[in-house]
Regions:
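Cysteine-dependent PTP/DSP-like catalytic domain, specifically the C-terminal lobe
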Residues: 157-167
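Glycine-rich acyl-CoA binding loop
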Residues: 130-139
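Non-catalytic substrate-recognition and accessory regions of acyl/acetyltransferase enzymes
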Residues: 1-129, 143-155, 168
């Protein structure tokens, strides 16, 4: 199967046949509370998934520059259980009901940051923006960095609008 799909028909056929469409993201579930989980994905171990995630993010972030060389990054996906809004087109189960879990955003960070950065990219996908999910992602980034003894800040090249909203 090709990495990129040319037609909508191919995309629909792939979506229906894809064995991963109702599975949780690859990687390790590092946090679960209430209606949310955070999965850690290693860009080296799950290269294609990370590349596709970054290419998808590029649709919404003008400043997104890394989307092929993903092996030096860790990705943290925010997964909502029974999300609002539920977008059933993104994955219908066998019974035609929308999937119960949805990736709603993510952040990434370098595995080895010489500048002690704890955040390289952060994005809440448009249907789920303005629900405070960005704060969950930033809080998770901060807490992980604190536990690692690596208190730094975001990359300096982050978009100005994102920097305005950072609480630390």
């Amino acid at each position: 199967m090709s990495k990129y799909l040319i037609t909508v028909l191919n995309a629909n056929m792939t979506q229906k046949a894809c064995p991963h469409r109702n599975a949780p993201p690859p990687g390790v579930n590092v946090y679960t509370k209430d209606n949310y989980s955070i999965y850690e994905i290693d860009g080296e171990k799950n290269k294609l998934y990370a590349q596709n995630l970054c290419l998808f993010a590029k649709l919404f972030l003008d400043t997104k520059s890394v989307f092929y060389d993903v092996t030096t990054f860790l990705y943290y996906l925010l997964v909502a259980h029974n999300p609002t809004p539920d977008i059933p087109i993104t994955g219908l189960g066998e019974d035609g009901i929308g999937q119960q879990e949805q990736v709603v955003g993510f952040f990434s960070k370098e595995k080895m940051s010489w500048d002690n950065n704890n955040l390289a990219c952060i994005l809440v996908f448009p249907p789920w923006q303005k629900q405070g999910l960005g704060q969950i992602l930033m809080g998770a980034s901060y807490e992980m960095s604190k536990r690692e003894g690596r208190l730094g800040g975001p990359e300096k090249r982050m978009h100005f609008q994102v920097l305005q909203r950072l609480p630390y």
